[in-house]
UniProtKB/Swiss-Prot annotation:
Residues 355-364 have a biased composition (Basic and acidic residues). Interacts with PCNA. Three molecules of FEN1 bind to one PCNA trimer with each molecule binding to one PCNA monomer. PCNA stimulates the nuclease activity without altering cleavage specificity. The keyword Mitochondrion applies. The gene is FEN1-A. PANTHER family: FLAP ENDONUCLEASE 1 (PTHR11081:SF9), FLAP ENDONUCLEASE FAMILY MEMBER (PTHR11081). Residues 123-254 are annotated as: I-domain. GO terms for cellular component: mitochondrion; nucleolus; nucleoplasm. GO terms for biological process: base-excision repair; DNA replication, removal of RNA primer. This is Flap endonuclease 1-A. Its EC number is 3.1.-.-. It comes from Sorghum bicolor.
Length: 380
């Protein structure tokens, strides 16, 4: 679920903290990617028609492999250096949310059977997507694929979003990419949405800057975490009747959930019984993450390994895979060359060129005015 309604809340109240970027603008950047979220998107979108999905000869789904392979190549061709982060064991506080998701999938599965029997194609299309679940096998398949491609894989001890945020805070990567907004709540300095969008449409990447988010909302990081808990997160229920705008107003007015609870109209708002908001806050502030991450390395692809895994084991077209491997090799050479050039060339700050240009403009205008004065207004 992520943080309920946070994107709209930020668009309405902190628009300067968000900006659209071209995919290619992240050339040379290391990006930590929430792998499970990406796999889920691929399973829903790639090669799906109604209930039918891409499979190998054994009938095993391969949509996740097709999506991960193609998207990663596109990232590499754009000069982006992806790091895929996989979920570990979820926190105990997430069990209730996971149970809700399981129940929803069960309901969708039952509704899907009825839709199939009724021949309702639209309902089948919609409900089949709701039954999708990322399995351990899907994760293992993608880890193997990425390692064969020479792309680093990080296995988080717990939440992938928290691990991604930690990598970003420790300057191991430039930004975090996911569709769930949790990474901002975990304190990722830069967060990207739509980087991994699997649709054919070229959707711009939306970049969020957490420092600007706090500045625009006029909140501290602790207050922002409390705001996210009030909006609704994966770790506990929220207070019914309090949406994003009301939550923001209350946090600005009272400063913390404790103070809000002391002043809240109990007749109007029902506070969840034994509400574990403090534990949720602790999970956002002190998540279980890897303290000493090994050096992230991008290596040449294992050509034989890729052909064996994709072509022999999963029925991919050998000619296409061979061409894709050449793309990977070419992209990695291009990305490496770009890094070397940026290393040897001095990079000016963003403000410096603007100041120089402004000075240059003023000088030009002054020279033009001086020339006009000397000309004495003579007509030609």
């Amino acid at each position: 679920m992520g943080i309920k309604g946070l994107t709209k809340l930020l668009a309405d109240n902190a628009p300067k903290a968000m900006k659209e970027q071209k995919f290619e603008s992240y050339f040379g950047r290391k990006i930590a990617i929430d792998a499970s979220m990406s796999i889920y998107q691929f399973l829903i979108v790639v090669g799906r028609t109604g209930m039918e999905t891409l499979t190998n000869e054994a009938g095993e789904v391969t949509s996740h492999l097709q999506g991960m392979f193609n998207r990663t190549i596109r990232l590499l061709e754009a000069g982006i250096k992806p790091v895929y982060v996989f979920d570990g064991k979820p926190p105990d506080m997430k069990k209730e949310e996971l149970a809700k998701r399981f129940s929803k999938r069960e309901d969708a599965t039952n509704d899907l059977k009825e839709a199939v029997e009724a021949g309702d194609k639209d309902a089948v299309e919609k409900l089949s997507k709701r039954t999708v679940k990322v399995t351990a096998q899907h994760n293992d398949d993608c880890k193997r694929l990425l390692r064969l491609m020479g792309v680093p894989v990080v296995e988080a001890p717990s939440e992938a979003e928290a691990e991604c945020a930690a990598l970003c805070k420790n300057d191991k990567v430039f930004a975090v990419a996911s569709e769930d907004m949790d990474s901002l709540t975990f304190g990722a300095p830069r967060f990207l949405r739509h980087l991994m969008d699997p649709s054919s449409k070229k959707i711009p990447v939306m970049e969020f800057d957490v420092a600007k988010v706090l500045e625009e909302l006029e909140l501290t990081m602790d207050q922002f975490i409390d705001l996210c808990i009030l909006c609704g997160c994966d770790y506990c229920d929220s207070i019914k009747g309090i949406g994003g705008q009301t939550a923001l107003k209350l946090i600005r007015q009272h400063g913390s959930i404790e103070s809000i609870l002391e002043n809240l109209n109990k007749d109007r708002y029902q506070i969840p019984e034994d509400w574990p908001y403090q534990e949720a806050r602790r999970l956002f502030k002190e998540p279980n993450v890897t303290l000493d991450v090994p050096e992230l390395k991008w290596t040449p692809p294992d050509e034989e390994g890729l052909i064996s895994f994709l072509v022999k084991d999963n029925g991919f077209n050998e000619d296409r895979v061979t061409k894709a491997i050449e793309k990977i090799k070419s992209a990695k050479n291009k990305s490496s060359q770009g890094r070397l050039e940026s290393f040897f060339k001095p990079v000016a700050t963003t403000s410096a060129p603007l100041k120089r240009k402004e000075t240059s403009d003023k000088t030009s205008k002054a020279a033009a005015a001086n020339k006009k004065t000397k000309a004495g207004g003579k007509k030609k």
